Amino acid sequence: MSNIGNVEILQIIDSVAREKGISKEILISTVEQAVQAAGRKKYGNEYDIKAQINRKTGEINLLRILKIVEDVEDYLTQISLEEALIKNPEAKIGDEIYEYLPPIDHARVSAQAAKQVITQRVIEAEREKQYHDFKDRKGEIINGIVKRIEYGDIIVDLSRAEAIIKKDQLIKGENFKPNDRIKAYVQDVRQETKGPQIFLSRVDNQMLVKLFKLEVPEILESIIQIKSVARDPGSKAKIAVFAADSSIDPVGSCVGIRGNRVKAVTNELNGEKIDIVLWSNDLAQFIVNALAPLAPGEITKILIDEDRHKVEVVVSQENQSIAIGRRGQNVRLASQLTGWNIDIMTEEQESKRRNEEFLTSTALFMEALDVEEVIGQLLSVTGFNSVEQIASSEISTLTRIEGFEEELAVEIKNRAINYVDLKNEKIIKKLEDLGVEQELIDILELSLELILQFAEYGIKTIEDLGEMSVNEFKNLAPNSNITDENIKLLIKTARQHGALKDS
């Protein structure tokens, strides 16, 4: 039997528990496990050994556990009922008998166990506590102190926790030093066994949204809604705002008296200039608003191509640079804000492009449908720019064209269908020859022509798609109406398919 007072261990445990905010019982149990491991090392792993620490005195006992059975098969872990009754008159089959083992060097073992195991358990418990304290704070703005800088990443002290701002999540040009105060957006909280668990960002769009919520009470109270955000962090941003109550001026409310509200946000984001525009469910009007500082009256024409998810904005020569912005920043942010690909062109450019498209589509229709030039021109003028559009159109749409009787309309539609079918057959044959998986064709849901472009680029399987980046996808399919989010979802789905195949 070991009957050694070890009040010092309890004092250490009590001190650590208070300082680190960790359960005292967890630390005691951890030390018991370490002493138990030392006992098994001395007496043999074949024994069922248990360590006990008295929660009041610190007394340590090392016990051998024997299971009471009818027929003893293992004398190291079992005991007969007859023998057990000698030790405990109330013993019965299935109970356990505890025998005290001779002491080991508890002073040394306990001290080492306390030092090593408590240290490790404190680290684990602190990480668990950090995760549980912050997992529900994802999506918040948080304040901290710069603790240190590691290879461009900033380690932030959050009092009882540490967070990290990766280099690519910092605004370009920012220069933080140890002990600087810093404000950031909690982008993610992950339970990890090592390394950072709390990930912060200063470039996330939601950082801007949360800052406006702090500065504009009407946003916090949902009187004003931020409908969309586009950022070039540290340089320029655009936000689209809306108020259901027509008596509220959402733009003015966000700007504030003498610009005090928007200035507060700008100052926090290293001088990032912010255009606050009015959101509208009328796409054309929203496009006009999003292109600020271009004045609405300077826009000559807006052409919306829903099939290609593209908008062409026609302006005068002198206003083109304003609309596009420095290095294309204004139109790029407006495109992100509205979710549409916006193309700025002058009246001269638009006229030239239309003429080129007219000539190209006319020639295409003449060749593909085997029709005279005048019919090809009429189809082009009506707005058709592909044979596929004609093949999928209603007969009633074609008969609206001047001079198109029903018989002619049916004939042209049939020729278009035959042309498209033949073209698709040829593409399918090429896809088969290239070894493209049918599963890839199904998941992409793009035209066969675009899928052929992917295949010729080397994307032939689900796994190939999973290895693509969003930019690679967009470069291969620049005119598709797939949003960045949907592209990410496609790639993610492809990766999951690949993982299932490997498992």
Curated annotation (Swiss-Prot):
The primary location reported for this protein is: cytoplasm
Tell me which Gene Ontology terms the entry assigns under biological process.
DNA-templated transcription termination; transcription antitermination
KH domain segment(s): 308-378
Subcellular location per UniProt equals:
Cytoplasm
Q: Name one GO cellular component term.
A: cytosol
The reply to whether Cytoplasm figures as a keyword in the UniProt entry is yes
Using the record's annotation, list all stretches that form the S1 motif domain: 139-203
Per the record, the domain of life is Bacteria
PROSITE patterns in UniProt:
KH_TYPE_1, S1
What GO terms are given for molecular function?
DNA-binding transcription factor activity; nucleotide binding; RNA binding
Task: Tell me which UniProt keywords the record has, alphabetically.
Answer: Cytoplasm, RNA-binding, Transcription, Transcription antitermination, Transcription regulation, Transcription termination
In terms of SMART domains, this protein maps to:
KH, S1
Similarity field: Belongs to the NusA family.
* Assembly with partners or alone: Monomer. Binds directly to the core enzyme of the DNA-dependent RNA polymerase and to nascent RNA.
Functional note: Participates in both transcription termination and antitermination.
Q: What is this protein called?
A: Transcription termination/antitermination protein NusA
Protein species of origin: Rickettsia conorii (strain ATCC VR-613 / Malish 7)
Gene behind this protein: nusA
